[in-house]
Amino acid sequence: MFKRLLLLQFLIAGGLSLVFLLPKTPPLQPSAVSMEMPNVLVLSGWTAGPKIDPSKKEVEALSKDTEFSRRNYYRSAGMDAPLGSREMMQASIVLSGKDLNNSVHRPERCLPAQGLNLISSSDLPVKLRDGRTITLKRLKCAGNDNTGKNPYTHLNYYWFVGHDSIKHTHYGRTIKDMRDRLVQGYDQRWAYITVSSNLVRARMEDETGQEYLSVQLSEEETDRNVMELVAELAPEIIDLKKVKSLE
């Protein structure tokens, strides 16, 4: 009887010791992005409005440890535009928490849920100030206002920033995430960065309540604006010294 009790204690102790051999949860590495967007982009002439809170739907749809940063950037339209006209682009950062699947959703699926119809997808290379180039995914969508009588074109540009890399596709980010988990032994937070613009001429109101006339730009003009803005914005919000690969 004594031997049986001793054997049982030995088996229990041995079983409990196996807990220490179980694989540990991989450490969570930070993204190379900063959530603080600059107030002014001097070289390209953009000035940011006040910080914009995430919508109730965004907060409810994403995990609680997801972080948000969003601002509208404005600048005066060209000399040929009506007095007081402005160009506007919205920049947004969504930083994933521990549960990546419930923090960063595939943009091609999110936009249709917002009432936008995806028309086409392409790549837009942007040359940064240090000479390196990052690639943005460019989505062209068709939208309409609340009345359904005023269609417009919506352009959305996005990319992802991980611990040491930049990706411009959902699949590229997923493969990099899996590789780092298996080979490097860590999980990482990913930042989903977007710059977007509605190609519409309309009377608008900014965050301070001031009215202005939004200039309707062409797709080519909007692409140039995005390239100028991102070329200056990206080095301000991304620690490029930590980034080993750009795509």
Where in the sequence are the language-model features?
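Generic detector of ordered secondary-structure context
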Residues: 38-39, 65, 185
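A short, solvent-exposed beta-edge/loop patch
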Residues: 4-17, 23, 124-247
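Short conserved aromatic/hydrophobic patches within beta-strands of well-structured domains
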Residues: 44-48
